[in-house]
Amino acid sequence: MDTLIINNFLPYPNQVRAWALQQEFFNAQQATQKYKEHTDWPGLRTDHVYELDQIYGNNVLTSVSNIITRMSGQQGLGIKSYFQLTNENDGDSWVHQDNDIDYAALLYLNPNADPSTGTTLYQCNNVDKWTSYMSDQSGYNKLKQINTKEDVELYEQLFTPVDIIGNMFNRLVIYKGDIYHKSNQYFGNTKEDSRLTQIFFITFQK
């Protein structure tokens, strides 16, 4: 199974949301300096949730791990998870894969969010051309502009939307890491009204 959607995932989503918003968030540059490992993503993220609270971290990571095991039939996996905030000043996201992991998941944590601010999954129409942009930094910077606001022509040439997943409070979305995907519209200006998700990265033990 490549994708799975579970509504009403957490038994106490309001408490988790309130607690998440109390945490310290970092941008990608700050995270790169803190962890001594280059990373690049829009908006702000917290530390790994297990470091924020071991009880919650253990509960939610175990739940997601069990679901992935049933989906894939694979035993033994590693999982990392963070809260992420993005707002209207973060522009438009870009279509990408998470090729360094086996599965990704995200949990929407905005009550009454506009459904159009969810996630789109894509088919890539020209993998060779898309991959060619990965060869150097200028190409990578170009990739980050392939969206519905900047390089629309190339966006429409390279990608066809396959699934549009609505942003629904307490909805968990799971998909394989090699699926092309993109966050849809960002919103808000403050912690309280920005797009809040909990993201998960899952890797099978070799």
Which residues make up each language-model segment?
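Non-heme Fe(II)/2-oxoglutarate
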Residues: 1-85, 89-93, 118, 125, ...
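Catalytic core of non-heme Fe(II) oxygenases with the double-stranded beta-helix
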Residues: 88-206
